[in-house]
């Protein structure tokens, strides 16, 4: 049974003044020191067609050269490739993960191109949820792979968004912070670029696509975020090559007709993107991922598992009540399954017994048949043996008679010879 515990309301809180220094004013410093020692993680998902400049822009944003293998247009499907890096600036360590959508937009049938991306984002949420639900959690050492920002690279067509872009962003907007950017903006004339930006934003609004809104509720960033929001989507140019401009070297793209400077705000919005993504709103992107997108996923998953905050009468549920209800439901299902399995087992045993009896009957019939056959064969052999024995006896009798006749004939011949001899001898005398 749940026990109701009273909680103080805001009206019950009293403001008190301190008579001396206590020391909790150092909490912000403690938090900064702890965060600095732990380091930070930031995960970026780059969604865009092959060859649109995703890797180059990442190299330019973080002022380094990341390892990246050039992708081909022959991928059978979309696959996501994640790579993690350890970066350090001053005394701040950042574990950066860049996830690339290899093969996106290269297939003839693009209907399911968004699915691997959604599945990857959900898989990272699920991994974090499973870690969070463990009895012995280790979130301090856990490598958080949830996507904090999705840079959606829009092809610089100058006309409108492709249906693939609209469908993909619509599928992703409830799962990740989408920041749309126009890639290779130096391929569009400036007047066309302004029209293209307006067209993109109107299409996003008309199709109900929710992109990341830069926070304006904090005084420290409200003004800059409000100013930068009107420039969405950012038209960017990426380059790691440095070109000499005047007396300085600057990152730029050299063309026969001139030079496009990456960090010149009159040429592109790269600086605005870097300010918004890294220097101003990186922590807000991390916070929005946890408090909005992950919480939505977590709530849906727990509701699927049967956990909820209120009963059908909108009365609050305690965790213990939810656990007991779920446990009883599980035990009921378990007993039902056990009974079904028992009945199935009994039925299978009966079927097996019937099969064994039938097999035993067949074996007995075969045995009886073999036994009769054996007896018949035995009788035939015995009869044949008797016939042979009779033939042997008859043969022996005939043989004995023949031998007797032969001996008698020999004796009679011998006697006759003797008589003739005696008669001859008598005549000489």
Curated annotation (Swiss-Prot):
The keyword Nucleotide-binding applies. One of its GO terms (cellular component) is septin complex. Keywords: Acetylation, Cell cycle, Cell division, Cell projection, Chromosomal rearrangement, Coiled coil, Cytoplasm, Cytoskeleton, GTP-binding, Nucleotide-binding, Phosphoprotein, Synapse. Residues 398-429 are annotated as: Disordered. One of its GO terms (biological process) is protein localization. Disulfide bonds: none annotated. The modification Phosphoserine is found at residue 9. Its main location: cytoplasm. Residues 38-304 form the Septin-type G domain. InterPro entries: G_SEPTIN_dom, P-loop_NTPase, Septin. Residues 401-416 have a biased composition (Low complexity). It is linked to A chromosomal aberration involving SEPTIN11 may be a cause of chronic neutrophilic leukemia. Translocation t(4;11)(q21;q23) with KMT2A/MLL1. This is Septin-11. The lineage of its organism: Eukaryota, Metazoa, Chordata, Craniata, Vertebrata. The gene is SEPTIN11.
């Amino acid at each position: 049974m749940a026990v109701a515990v009273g909680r103080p309301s805001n009206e019950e809180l009293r403001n008190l003044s301190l008579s001396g220094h206590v020391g909790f004013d150092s909490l912000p410093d403690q938090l900064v020191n702890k965060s600095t020692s732990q380091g930070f993680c930031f995960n970026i998902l780059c969604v865009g067609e092959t060859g649109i400049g995703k890797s180059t822009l990442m190299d330019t944003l973080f002022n380094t050269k990341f390892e990246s293998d050039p992708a081909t247009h022959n991928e059978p499907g979309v696959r996501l490739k994640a790579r993690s890096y350890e970066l350090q600036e001053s005394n701040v360590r950042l574990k950066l993960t860049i996830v690339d959508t290899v093969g996106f937009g290269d297939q003839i049938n693009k209907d399911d191109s968004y699915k691997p991306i959604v599945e990857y984002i959900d898989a990272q949420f699920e991994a974090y949820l499973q870690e969070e639900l463990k009895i012995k959690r280790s979130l301090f050492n856990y490598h958080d792979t949830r996507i904090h920002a999705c840079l959606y690279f829009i092809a610089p067509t100058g006309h409108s968004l492709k249906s693939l872009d609209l469908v993909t962003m619509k599928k992703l907007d409830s799962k990740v912070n989408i920041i749309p950017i126009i890639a290779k903006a130096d391929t569009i004339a400036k007047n066309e670029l302004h029209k293209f930006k307006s067209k993109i934003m109107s299409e996003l609004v008309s199709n109900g696509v929710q992109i990341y809104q830069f926070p304006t509720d904090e005084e420290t960033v409200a003004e800059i975020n409000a100013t930068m929001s009107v420039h969405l989507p950012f038209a960017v140019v990426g380059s790691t090559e440095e070109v000499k401009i005047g007396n300085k070297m600057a990152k730029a793209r050299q063309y026969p007709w001139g030079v496009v400077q990456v960090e010149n705000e009159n040429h592109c919005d790269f600086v605005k993107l870097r300010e918004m993504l890294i220097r101003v709103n990186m922590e807000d992107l991390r916070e929005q991922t946890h408090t909005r997108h992950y919480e939505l996923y977590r709530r849906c998953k727990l509701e699927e598992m049967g956990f909820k905050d209120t009963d059908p009468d909108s009365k609050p549920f305690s965790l213990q009540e939810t656990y007991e209800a779920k446990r009883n439901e599980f035990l009921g299902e378990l007993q039902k399954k056990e009974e079904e399995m028992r009945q199935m087992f009994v039925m299978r045993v009966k079927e097996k017994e019937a099969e064994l009896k039938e097999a035993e009957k067949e074996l007995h019939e075969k045995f009886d048949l073999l036994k009769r056959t054996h007896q018949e064969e035995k009788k035939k052999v015995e009869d044949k043996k008797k016939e042979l024995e009779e033939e042997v006896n008859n043969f022996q009798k005939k043989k004995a008679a023949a031998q007797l006749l032969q001996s008698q004939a020999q004796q009679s011949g011998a006697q006759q010879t003797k008589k003739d001899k005696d008669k001859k001898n008598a005549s000489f005398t």
